[in-house]
From Swiss-Prot:
Protein name: Small ribosomal subunit protein bS6
Gene giving rise to this polypeptide: rpsF
GO cellular component: cytoplasm; ribonucleoprotein complex; ribosome
Role according to the record: Binds together with bS18 to 16S ribosomal RNA.
NCBIfam families linked to this entry: S6 (TIGR00166)
Source species: Streptococcus uberis (strain ATCC BAA-854 / 0140J)
Assigned protein family: Belongs to the bacterial ribosomal protein bS6 family.
Entry keyword annotation includes Endoplasmic reticulum: no
A GO molecular function held by the record: structural constituent of ribosome
Gene3D superfamilies documented for this protein: 3.30.70.60
UniProt keyword list: Ribonucleoprotein, Ribosomal protein, RNA-binding, rRNA-binding
Keyword Ribonucleoprotein: yes
Biological processes per GO annotation: translation
Pfam families for this protein: Ribosomal_S6
């Protein structure tokens, strides 16, 4: 199984309940498509290097995933691009 790290930035003015729902929704997208979540945790609220959609800060969330194929990652990528609450996201394949 290949190991991946997903980092995404959530808009800072989201309510706590909505943020938790967003995180659980994207975690379930990964698991429903065959990936195994090793760890999913909030990182911290950080200042952005440049302004994104009028925001200067963002809530960082990091997910470590194991997957045999890229189906779950492609679906995560597709849905993260069209979600207005996620400012940016990045998927990195880790060395085994």
């Amino acid at each position: 199984m290949a190991k991946y790290e997903i980092l995404y930035i959530i808009r800072p003015n989201i309510e706590e309940e909505a943020k938790n729902a967003l995180v659980s929704r994207f975690d379930s997208i990964l698991t429903d498509n065959g990936a195994t979540i090793v760890e999913s945790k909030d990182w911290e609220k950080r200042r952005l290097a440049y302004e994104i959609n009028d925001f200067r800060e963002g809530l960082y969330h990091i997910v470590n995933v194991e997957s045999e194929d890229a189906v779950a990652l492609n679906e995560f990528d597709r849905l993260a691009k069209i979600n207005g609450d996620i400012l940016r996201h990045m998927i990195v394949k880790l060395d085994a």
